Amino acid sequence: MHEQYQAPLPVNSPALPEPFYYLHNFRAVLAWIGERYADLLDDQERAFIAAFAELPEASQALLVRMVMRKGTLFREGKLAYAEIGDTRAAVQPLLALGWVDAQPTLELAQLFGLLKKDELSQLFRDHLGRANLRKDALLERLQPLFPEARRLAEWQADFAEPVYELRCMALCDRLRLMYFGNLWQDWSEFVLADLGIYRYESVEFSADSRGFRLRADVDAYLHLFDCRQRFDLGEPLEELLAGLPGEPYANPWLEGRRVKLLFQFAQHCEKQRDFDLAQRLYRQSSHPGARLRAIRSLERGERFAEAHALAREASCAPESDAERQGLARLLPRLQGKLGLPRQARAAAPEIDRLDLCLAFPSEPCSVEWAVREHLEEPGCAVHYVENGLINSLFGLLCWEAIFAAIPGAFFHPFHSAPADLHSADFRQRRAALFEACLGRLEDGSYRDAIRCRYRDKFGLQSPFVYWELLGEELLEQALDCLPAAHLRAWFERLLEDIPGNRAGLPDLIQFWPAQRRYRMVEVKGPGDRLQDNQLRWLQFCREREMPVAVCYVRWHVDD
């Protein structure tokens, strides 16, 4: 294919002025892990850290470049970097350590990932005739003819450009997991922080602050992550369930991941109409909503007596407002199926209704924005806030509690939220801090506290504050027009169930600054209906006589 391979000239990295920025970050991670996780490392991992420190700088940099790239297979020409220089020289120590392989065995799909279409067409010309197929169609045609993996030289003897396979990716992923406490964060966090794109709150935590206490916990996380990946790739559920621990993990955080995976497996079964397996998996899971889905699966499987018994049990102690709402629908229906007296449903508070017939927008815009434009008038400001305003005010007022250095909540510099944010004991572990923050609503100091946090923390990552939404005008109108008692009620509800209650708030908020009053408005276009979490928030507000309305929109189209 190539008579002689000539590597392209390397180019400078555009990311940061310091050419080895990524290497400095990787070294910092290794030092952090060595300081905090030495007791969780095995001999291979310790040897990796020690050997990495002894490598020439160019070899260190090349390895880190490969680790940060997508995949594990690279043509040499794709590894050309000005700061590294001669790629072939830099890779030699990595080959000697076995961290990189210069003779990888490639399946056909991997070969297709490396080569361009014209290279593939030339390589397989004897099998294609005159067919001019897309690359994916070409792979589909050739797959039955080449089921076995081969070395590159066996695929193409005269392919002159070296291909390298990274062999230590699993080890590096494990180190990344130990540092971040998860696998959804990656090495780009450092770059985004260095560039100022993301800025994080500085939390003081000690050297023993870490995400994992036991090596077995790291193993368990990786196992659950692998199960989820295999599930996404379509591996039979029976095989996955056989490898999933049947007993709860002692670590609450890992147990949360296990029961969530069971919940996701059960959802899959429910979609496949395997209601028996679905209800069994739901009942093995304590993930929020699992019990309600188990009842629903029993009902759909026409096991009405079992569904009714479980629903009665749940109604004695609902786990959340969402479950209470679902049970209020399910129980009367199940009672009807069983010929039992139907339980009367409590009457929901009357929600103010606003009906609008608006001219169809001449330019594309959302129905919420059209209503905002219609409602705004002199003396009345209208903002499209949805969940952003109340969450932001809560996040600013309670900043100290949210970012308190509670053990296990923060263990690296890139936390946008405490690791236990969704834990059942999140508030309890910070009870005094939250009470102090919320107490400002009682003594009137909350306005100054929120303004101070807005100035001091502006732009820092937060799980609650929508900086792009919360301009100073909106903030001041909210502080002037929203009663402290209403803020306290909303914030208390958020803390009761953060994952369940942080969404569902009305789309718009109207302010009448001169009168220091407000109204929240949920907007529904033609064919839209209120979602369950929206209904719960609307009911919550009306029960407390908070001004809220639902606006139903019809479009008027001129002939």
Curated annotation (Swiss-Prot):
Instruction: List ligand-binding residues for Mn(2+) 2.
Output: 386, 507
Name the chemical reaction catalysed here: Hydrolytically removes 5'-nucleotides successively from the 3'-hydroxy termini of 3'-hydroxy-terminated oligonucleotides
Gene name, per UniProt, is: fan1
Give the enzyme's main class according to its UniProt record, as a single word. Answer: hydrolase
Official protein name in the record:
Fanconi-associated nuclease 1 homolog
Known EC number(s)?
3.1.4.1
- Note the SS bond partners: none
- Gene Ontology BP, a term: interstrand cross-link repair
